[in-house]
């Protein structure tokens, strides 16, 4: 049981770090024809990044930014609550609070990346038809899966 909790803790930390990276880095869409990429915050072309996104004033990208930041916050809160529950909770109880907080993180990731997918991932306004999703977009979907698994495992596990 201790090994399972330690492994869950390590995966939770890795998920939080991956959420930081996927939110901060500017590689959500990559152009095949040039050294160019677009993120949530900046547009990078030829190694020069500027804060001017072609869709920067749209409400959808602001919603994606907000939900990704909320997912990071809820992931960190869940991690702190888990550590707190690990040392203060009585034996036999479940990690409901940390699990439910992680599932809120999962929901924030789902909403944020779904909005991005609907509005920007397949649009030709970013580059052209020869662009593809970058590693941040893929990393966010991986974090989506990990946060769901972590949240469910927190809800199921009991402290021994």
UniProtKB/Swiss-Prot annotation:
Entry-linked InterPro entries: EMP_1, PMP-22/EMP/MP20-like, PMP22/EMP/MP20/Claudin, PMP22_EMP_MP20
Cited PROSITE patterns: PMP22_1, PMP22_2
Gene Ontology BP, a term: bleb assembly
Residues carrying covalently attached carbohydrate according to the record: 35, 43, 128
Main location: membrane
Gene3D superfamilies in alphabetical order: 1.20.140.150
Designated name of the protein: Epithelial membrane protein 1
Organism from which the protein derives: Mus musculus
């Amino acid at each position: 049981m201790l090994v399972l909790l330690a492994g869950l803790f390590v995966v939770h930390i890795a998920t939080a770090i991956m959420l930081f990276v996927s939110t901060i880095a500017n590689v959500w869409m990559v152009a095949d024809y040039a050294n160019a990429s677009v993120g949530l915050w900046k547009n990078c072309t030829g190694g020069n990044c500027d804060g001017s996104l072609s869709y920067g004033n749209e409400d959808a990208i602001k919603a994606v930014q907000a939900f990704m930041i909320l997912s990071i916050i809820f992931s960190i809160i869940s991690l702190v609550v888990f550590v707190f529950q690990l040392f203060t909770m009585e034996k036999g109880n479940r990690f409901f609070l940390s699990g439910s907080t992680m599932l809120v993180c999962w929901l924030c990731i789902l909403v944020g990346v779904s909005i991005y997918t609907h509005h920007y991932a397949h649009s030709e306004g970013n580059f052209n038809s020869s662009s593809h999703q970058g590693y941040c977009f893929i990393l966010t979907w991986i974090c989506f899966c990990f946060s769901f698994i972590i949240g469910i495992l927190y809800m199921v596990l009991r402290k021994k």
